[in-house]
From Swiss-Prot:
Domain BPL/LPL catalytic residue range list: 34-209
Organism: Shewanella loihica (strain ATCC BAA-1088 / PV-4)
E.C. number(s) listed in UniProt: 2.3.1.181
Residue intervals passing through the bilayer: none
Name of the featured protein: Octanoyltransferase
Enzyme class: transferase
Organism classification: Bacteria, Pseudomonadati, Pseudomonadota, Gammaproteobacteria, Alteromonadales
Protein family according to the UniProt entry: Belongs to the LipB family.
Subcellular location: Cytoplasm
């Protein structure tokens, strides 16, 4: 667990295109040192498919007019779009004294505990990172660790057009069904989901203080 006085800085980015946020994550990670602060970026993206480092082109079935971007995270192809909460933890896991597997577990548990606030029984799977409800995937994970620091993160389906998921094999699984929060009487908006996830994420990682920022610059 981190020190009790560890602060987590929350950046509320609103809706921003994927590539600009991705490159900002890379830049922050490349330039950080042992004094750099841990941040959690909360964002919503316009429609985009992102293909992880393990991704295979055959899992992109029919992208149509939605762009496909090859990125430097783990995992296979996924979809981001309006109505989906995306959260990027930019953490010094060396300083936190946790490994990547523990970080994945902590992220999954923060989602599970957030959904439990609404009476939704969600769970992770050992062989397929992410969070599931009744065998349907409600949240996807894909991380990258560089210099002992994390970037990329999670995507939670809240209230979105789910049809683009039918154009891919989500996370490389043909026929994988997806779920979202609103029909399950979970959080009804990305904003509501973000507020609750910030709470459970900071508790799961042991952060005692939160500081909020708007946009990518202070």
């Amino acid at each position: 667990m981190p020190l009790k006085d560890t602060v987590l800085h929350i950046r509320h980015l609103g809706r921003q295109d994927y590539e600009s946020v991705w490159h900002a994550m890379q830049e922050y990670t490349d330039n950080r040192d042992e004094t750099s602060r841990d941040e959690l970026w909360i964002v919503e993206h316009p429609p985009v498919f992102t293909q992880g480092q393990a991704g295979k082109s055959e899992h992109i079935l029919n992208p149509g007019d939605i762009p496909v971007i090859q990125v430097d995270r783990g995992g296979q192809v996924t979809y981001h779009g309006p109505g989906q909460l995306v959260a990027y933890p930019l953490l010094d896991i060396k300083r936190l004294k946790i490994g990547v597997r523990q970080l994945v577990t902590d992220i999954e548990q923060s989602i599970v505990k957030m959904l439990a606030l609404y009476g939704i029984e969600a769970y992770p799977k050992a062989d397929a990172p992410g969070v599931y409800v009744e065998e349907r995937k409600i949240a996807s994970l894909g991380l990258r660790i560089r210099k002992g620091c994390s970037f990329h993160g999670l995507a939670l389906n809240v209230d979105m057009d789910m049809s683009p998921f039918q154009r891919i094999n989500p996370c490389g699984y043909a026929g994988l069904e997806m779920a979202q929060c609103k029909p399950l009487k979970g959080p009804q908006s990305v904003e509501e989901a973000g507020e609750k996830l910030i709470q459970t994420f900071s508790q799961e990682l042991g952060y005692q203080h939160l500081e909020h920022h708007q946009g990518l610059t202070d």
